[in-house]
């Protein structure tokens, strides 16, 4: 039976390193596009130089990504095998995240030590990133009453199982409590990596298939979707 690992998969094929596109510089951020499987994209690989960097990540295969503290027993490798997707683990966040090619916009923001956006406080480091995301979505007329959560982690229904069901520092919600932008962090003395994501399509059935549970109406309505909109240019401009 397939096993769950920090870099492995449910056995659905060979693993490949992420492939980087040609970097460019916009404003003061270097922008890099990467494509690869979920495990490769989650590897902690800081930029070669201490330059603020935006990495736009494109998942090439479907995966259920467990959070750093989530029990392996939450996931069912056999269901993943039958569904043709991976089960991997990231080293940040709480609940699981569902990834599918084209199903989300995933942007990692790397902040080097000493940068104006660096802050030792996790919530204060996430807040300006969330505000940049909020502004990018507002500029595209997405969501109603979008706001940035500046407090700590808050539990909600399903949040121990599904990351986008909970609320954490810097995350963007709308007036009805739907979460639009998820943010998690990993830190060293040299870098903060803020992993951010919005869903183009929220599929609660796919997101919970590998967990062996059936989504209810609350979870089905808990996440905002951006469709075909392109928020990345606006996000970078707002950072």
Feature locations, PLM:
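Active-site loop/lid in soluble adenylation, ligation, and acyl-transfer enzymes
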Residues: 2, 19-82, 86-90, 96, ...
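Residue-identity detector for glycine
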Residues: 8-13, 21
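Cationic, low-complexity basic patches in intrinsically disordered or flexible, solvent-exposed regions
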Residues: 16
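A glycine-rich, hydrophobic loop/mini-helix early in the fold
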Residues: 77-121
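Short histidine-centered catalytic/ligand-binding loop motif
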Residues: 109-126, 219-229
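Long, positively charged amphipathic alpha-helical accessory segments at protein N-termini or as interdomain linkers
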Residues: 130-158, 186-239
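Aromatic/basic-lined ligand-recognition segments
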Residues: 162-173, 177-185
